Amino acid sequence: MRYTVEYTSKALKSLKKLDKPVLLMIKSWIEKNLIGTTEPRRHGKGLTSNRSVQWMYRVGDYRIIADIEDEKLVILVVEVEHRSRVYK
């Protein structure tokens, strides 16, 4: 059973603001590691506190915050930001 990747409107808005090389790096990483995966938690780290149901993926100096919906086999990308701004 393979997972698909979907994006929230906030995540799409964040992606549009990125420089082209950074955008290509993040898209390439998502295609390589998340699209079609059977183990979406393998490359990420579970968050704690008020974001305990979300997962974080490191891509260079950027972070991808996602919800993993096992019953739908969907990885929902919630936020993409530079590491200095993502948790604020």
Task: Show the residue positions of the predicted features.
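Enriched for short, Lys/Arg-rich terminal
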Residues: 2-4, 9, 13, 17, ...
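A short, surface-exposed loop/turn module that caps and links secondary-structure elements
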Residues: 31-56
